[in-house]
């Protein structure tokens, strides 16, 4: 049976970086579930299909190849906006959750990060983490990431976008963003990624020892 680490949290909280570090440390497979929605959105855009037709979006979502998710390509702002539109569709979420659950069965273990892993996708995960940080800190991280990459950004715009995404994610009727009752909270507002990794590693090691 696969060992699953579920990592949830709002945008720019550091869950993606933490997930990749954990996957590398333990030799687990990693899936950023947000990219699955972006991949479905990109496929719709590329095919010139509407973003407001749930049946079409569901069919497209079922054809997403989870092994070919290119973060660099899928990080485009336009794709993110399109992904937000189809992510609220229950049929699309069901289709992608099925694919995500199938991915979670991979041996020897998997790390899935997103918004509803511990609550919906993998409620029986061995370890559940909820990674968060203040909106101000998350906006600053996103701003620094863009500027460091050579882009231009406005902090106020990013901050408002972060708050808007939080409201949308937490207020969604289908699979809203919230910590699982048995999730371990990691607030990275004033915590380095290394400290967050060590905290997660301690929890994972304890859980792994229980499975031996």
From Swiss-Prot:
InterPro entries: Cytidylate_kin (IPR003136), Cytidylate_kinase_dom (IPR011994), P-loop_NTPase (IPR027417). Its main location: cytoplasm. The keyword Transmembrane does not apply. Disulfide bonds: none annotated. GO terms for molecular function: ATP binding; CMP kinase activity; dCMP kinase activity. GO terms for biological process: pyrimidine nucleotide metabolic process. Gene3D superfamilies: P-loop containing nucleotide triphosphate hydrolases. It catalyses: CMP + ATP = CDP + ADP; dCMP + ATP = dCDP + ADP. The keyword Cytoplasm applies. Its EC number is 2.7.4.25. It is found in: Cytoplasm. Pfam families: Cytidylate_kin. It is an enzyme of class 2 (transferase). One of its GO terms (cellular component) is cytoplasm. SUPFAM superfamilies: P-loop containing nucleoside triphosphate hydrolases. ATP binds at residues 9-17. Keywords: ATP-binding, Cytoplasm, Kinase, Nucleotide-binding, Transferase. Belongs to the cytidylate kinase family. Type 1 subfamily. This is Cytidylate kinase. The gene is cmk.
